[in-house]
């Protein structure tokens, strides 16, 4: 007998908090029960009831080649046959580190972790150890994982649940976290004039992907670089989402701004749990065992994850890969903008190569305030309309969507046809 998503969700709620292992999956942001996935291939996945969906989440970013790319699967199978993990150094983690250092402009040395959250925790500790300072600056709606000091006005699932900050975070932990509006350079300059020489680091998503998709305004990242240089603090780019996606060298290559530290995740693991933090040797040598800043992990550099990530990154080096991905993203987003205008439904469409944010709003979306002003209820209706037509978007108005190389002209055309039909119903509802 075929199980249903509804039945599985009911069962899950009896043994998993909220029925899910990451809050956004619970569909709280759009209503209804989540669909439970059985298998995936290329740009599609199938739920446990056998229905096929065009996937624009891609495991929240890692599946840049689509699901089940044969070269990635072959690399994983080969490593599994050699061993799942050893708790000791391996050649494949050296290969991975060498490739990351070669591809990312701001990285000369890299330390592997098991998640993006761990990578950011390490980067913050490293910045504090390197500078001898305590304060950090982050931006509203930027999500950097669920470590205590960064769960202050965070984006992603925290916004979906209407909890921009988390219970269980002591005031003493968060009091050194200063929060500023994203894309507001004058606010940064003003804050640094007051606290600059106490600030260890400014951490930023160079493209905010956890409150939809909000690119940086011209001059914003350059301004952060200049301010950090002025006050001697560490600039961290959280490229867990943008790394290897928006360009081969990440957002720092796309925008031409080099941070002091870079955090990575998602694509670097090819779908398996991996994170990384990297930067110049001068800073990275502060990490144990060569320096006084402690970091460790039982599964860090896991060989199966390294195999998946290495195969994924090598496929990205094929000439023209990111140009094609950018072109397909533009076709999708410009096509949706045309259809929304024709339907008389106000939408703001933000996109960078391989990522997009679709907002039901009259005014351009450039920061936290304008994200929150968008119509999340209309997004929920749009989401369910597309879901019924076999198109799976992020189940939250505050998450970016992702394209893969497997999303071809046929899939994009089918998506736009479905969107056109749903937009017509939204206009009627209005």
Curated annotation (Swiss-Prot):
Is the keyword Cytoplasm in the record?
Answer: yes
What EC number is given for this enzyme? Answer: 5.4.3.8
- Matching Pfam families, A to Z? Aminotran_3
Q: Name one GO biological process term.
A: protoporphyrinogen IX biosynthetic process
Tell me the superkingdom of the source.
Bacteria
Q: List the keywords (alphabetical).
A: Cytoplasm, Isomerase, Porphyrin biosynthesis, Pyridoxal phosphate
User: Catalytic activity, per the record?
Assistant: (S)-4-amino-5-oxopentanoate = 5-aminolevulinate
User: Any one cellular component term from GO for this entry?
Assistant: cytoplasm
Q: In which pathway does it act?
A: Porphyrin-containing compound metabolism; protoporphyrin-IX biosynthesis; 5-aminolevulinate from L-glutamyl-tRNA(Glu): step 2/2
Write out the GO MF terms.
glutamate-1-semialdehyde 2,1-aminomutase activity; pyridoxal phosphate binding; transaminase activity
Write out the annotated subcellular location: Cytoplasm
- Could you describe the subunit structure of this protein? Homodimer.
UniProt record similarity statement:
Belongs to the class-III pyridoxal-phosphate-dependent aminotransferase family. HemL subfamily.
Q: What is this protein called?
A: Glutamate-1-semialdehyde 2,1-aminomutase
Q: Which organism is it from?
A: Acidithiobacillus ferrooxidans (strain ATCC 23270 / DSM 14882 / CIP 104768 / NCIMB 8455) (Ferrobacillus ferrooxidans (strain ATCC 23270))
